Amino acid sequence: MIIRRVAVALLLTIVFAPAGFARGVLKFTVDLRDTKSHQVHVTLVPSGFQGHTATYQMPLWAPGAYSVTHYGRYVRNFKAFNKWHHTLAVKQLNDDRWQIASGQSVKKIEYDVLDSHSDTSSLYFAMANIDTSLFFANATALFGYYDDDKNAGAEVIYQLPDGWKLECPLDAPSGTRKPDPSHRSHPTDPNFMARNYDELADAPIIAAPMIDSGRASNRIITRSFQEGSADYDVAVMTDGTFYDSEMDSLVYYLREIVHAETDFFHDTPYKDYTFEITAPSFSHMPSFAQGALEHANSSDYLLMDMSWPLFKREFLPIFSHEFFHLWNVKRIHSTLLGPFDYTQRVMTKSLWMAEGITEYYAHTLLARYGIIPPERFYQDVSDWRKEMAMAPEEAKKKSLEELSIDESAFDMDEATLFYSRGPLVALMLDLEIRSRTNNKKSLDDVMFAFNDAAKHGKTFREEDMIPLFEKYSGIDLSDFYNRYIHGTDSLPVDTYLAMMGRARAASSGSVSLGFSGGNFILNSLDTTNALARAGLKAGDALIAINGTKLSLDNIDRLAALKDSLSSVSVTIERDGKTMDIPVTFTKPTNGQGVDPVPSPLAIEIRKGIVGQ
């Protein structure tokens, strides 16, 4: 239930700690009522702090995003006041930290937060997008912690424009969780509570005009559902049309994913969960990549408004990936990934486990539980191989552990290896365990054991990770580790696929597309692809195929012409010039399929991985 408060009055009174809070309490008010200048005003009233000096710390990075951001760079007009509303002396110590000399005199702090979503050095879903018709923020972009006390409780009031709705996964101050979505998203001053800074920082926010207030440039559409013992909210902020008609289908597939993964772990590590989706139309899609970010009981997404076939193919694995993170990384993680130090860059060797194993299960569980056909999973394996082949040569020279430690690994060029080489190594690891134990053990058993330990608050030291894999699987993995995780040996994927009765995957060359200025852009393409053979190159804008302008509604149909025609004419734009280029297709020569005489063990292993 939303508890409405008179924010101005609260800012001038002493705030008492709600039950369960630590000694300090922070009461924030975020004013979204005037965002024409692409910034929001934040007011903070601290209570219960006794230091002679006080500090305010914005985070260096956001959990799940890993890359260094320095959120303090987007803070302006930082001021502190005493009870007479006189300004106090403030010294900015670095990008993210402010010191207030008279700590005991501080009654209020104010600052502005600038829009940061267009900073291409950071991930969209870790930043803040502040506009007159929409608001999205990862909480690390808005809030810091006071007096170095990350255990202090917090309350947040969001002051909204008339007719707006806001979604946030935090509790109401009463402790009531999501009693009624129509009330919880009430447009007037929604109010939330966090028990500590970790909880506050892990709660993303989206807000926009309500759909029933009339068609706007952006609007928010919500649905709710129950699955098992938990409640789920789905909130989509969009200026497109896809979700108007497809929300019920979206909820159906989200429920299927939730069922699959909670059934897999026999575990639901939350009471409620929120899916927050920012879905721009094609013409308003930022030029940088789509994606998502996991949180303790929510996930947020930047996913373009599109046709349903494209949505099912491209986005269901993304939802599956972020949801699996509830176990693998939010609960199962090394000591370096929690409790968090928001002032230091994380130097962990285990991101290959957090991202690569998660990406593997995101796809294999969709197949295992019948959400996608098994053949789709094998196509995913083929796609991972193509993506890995297109990674920069310098990145290929690094092991998965080196990429994990390397700060630049979350640059898009290198990050692709976490989501291509990473799941391939996870598949190979699963097959290694299954084949050497006659399918008595698997990577599933390893993840179950990690989860059982993590339920009781046990993290693992980085140096203990592989020994724990060996303990839980019952086999020596030193050679596998030295070659494919610590080392950079070529991945013998075909050899491992044979362990589950699969022949070599077909390869016709891969293409990676981006979006800019309302056009599809070739980000990269395999040299074996027909487009590359015809002379197209990275950076070209794809305008039309056989004279028909490309759009989200027809790109699948036009791309499928390669199956029925021997050639097409592709219109591109390069260096400001438009040209038509003939493209000739050839059929893949290496087929994909089931081994004609798979062993009984291979059949059993295949069933264990993809269900049939």
Residue ranges: model-predicted function:
Residues 1-8:
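Bacterial N-terminal signal peptides that target proteins for export
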Residues 8-17:
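Bacterial N-terminal signal peptides
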Residues 18-22:
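Sec/Tat signal peptide C-region and signal peptidase I cleavage site
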Residues 23-61, 140:
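Early extracytoplasmic/domain-onset interaction patches
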Residues 44, 223-350:
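Juxtacatalytic substrate-recognition/specificity segment
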Residues 292, 299, 306, 331-332, ...:
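Post-HExxH zinc-binding segment in Zn-dependent metallohydrolases
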Residues 362-363, 371-612:
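C-terminal recognition in membrane/secretory proteostasis and scaffolding
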